[in-house]
Every structure is written in C-alpha cells, then in structure tokens.
C-alpha cells in the first residue's frame, strides 16, 4: 500500500488533471441540447474516485468491494471524508473511465529501460452463453480466442519493463490479432532495446 504522503501526492496530480480535463470538455465537447439531462451531483470528486481505483490495483485485493468496504470506508475515512455507499461508487466509476485512462497515459506510465515485455489478456463482458442477449457493448465487443478458450469482449494489450512498470496499453475488440497493436507507431515508438513476447507475436512484418 502507498503511504499517506504518496496518496496525497497522487490525489494532487489527479485533481489538477481533472480540473484541466473538465475545462477542455466544457469548452470543446459536443452536446445534444434536445435532451434534458438529469444529473445527480456526487459528494465525492472525480479525483477521489480515480485515486481509490489506483489504490485498489496496488493493494493486493482481488475484490473491489472488499477493498472499498474494508479499507476505504474503515481505515481511510480521514483521507476520503465524503465516502459514498459501494453501490453508488460503482455508478460513479463509469464517469471517470475516460479521464482515468488519459491520466494513466499522461502521468503514471513508467520509462523504457531497454528490456520490455508485451502481452495481452481478455476482458470478458459476459459469459459465452449470454452473447446473443448482451446489449451494453453490442456492436463493439467481439468474439476472440485466448489460451483459455473463446470469449466475448475486448483485449487489453500491455507493455511493461522488467521492474513491472506499465509502459503503454491499448484496448481493442476481442477479435484483433495480438500483433496488430505493435504495428501502430504510437504504441511502441518509445520502446528501445529488446521487446519480449510469446510465440503468438512472431511475424515477418515485425522484424
């Protein structure tokens, strides 16, 4: 777990980023003025929610609910005095999905050391038996195959260094070949030295 000083540092960076992000969205985002938007204001800020998500992924917990209830609500109330119920927190998570991804891309990525590793992992959106009735990601998620078999959803492509620091990531539909992201210059342009992957990444186009 991070120290309180480190949590405060991450919160400061996240809060500064959210302020900039919201100002850009307010200025440039397109709006549908025909629809009346009902928006329930949250007592927790976007930056607080982002920090809690970051803390969870560094905590060793496998269940977000257990982490939120046992750690945040019990032992971190002095850091997050306006915590909401877990159900409400889950609702608020979707509001920070885009700013969190951009925050990680711009602020939290590590640096290439000359030895990097690339791999992908499936992000399932539903069980295979429910594919035909799935609506949330209909038209976006696709059937894919990994070492564990067929799945329906997306693929998370990751590059990290030998210290375990995340260097870059990309999310694609499940049917995208693992080698495809490596063909995008922006995904690997900063990588130098050796890039290690399994045999699924062998391709003439990558050499």
Indicate where each model-derived feature is located.
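Short alpha-helical elements
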Residues: 1-207
């Amino acid at each position: 777990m991070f120290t309180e000083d480190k949590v405060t540092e991450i919160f400061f960076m996240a809060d500064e980023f959210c302020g900039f992000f919201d100002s850009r969205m307010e200025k440039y985002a397109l709006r549908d003025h025909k629809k009346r938007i009902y928006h329930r204001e949250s007592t927790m800020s976007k930056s607080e929610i982002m920090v809690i998500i970051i803390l969870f992924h560094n905590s060793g917990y496998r269940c977000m609910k257990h982490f939120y209830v046992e750690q945040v609500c019990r032992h971190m109330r002095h850091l997050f005095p306006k915590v909401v119920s877990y159900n409400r927190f889950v609702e608020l998570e979707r509001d920070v999905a885009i700013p969190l991804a951009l925050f990680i891309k711009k602020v939290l990525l590590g640096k290439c050391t000359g030895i990097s590793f690339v791999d992908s992992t499936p992000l399932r959106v539903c069980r295979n038996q429910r594919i035909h009735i799935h609506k949330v990601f209909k038209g976006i998620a696709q059937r894919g195959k990994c070492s564990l078999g067929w799945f329906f959803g997306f693929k998370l492509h990751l590059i990290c260094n030998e210290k375990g620091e995340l260097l870059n990531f990309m999310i694609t539909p499940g049917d995208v070949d693992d080698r495809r992201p490596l063909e995008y210059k922006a995904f690997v342009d900063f990588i130098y030295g050796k890039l290690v992957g399994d045999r699924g990444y062998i391709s003439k186009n990558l050499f």
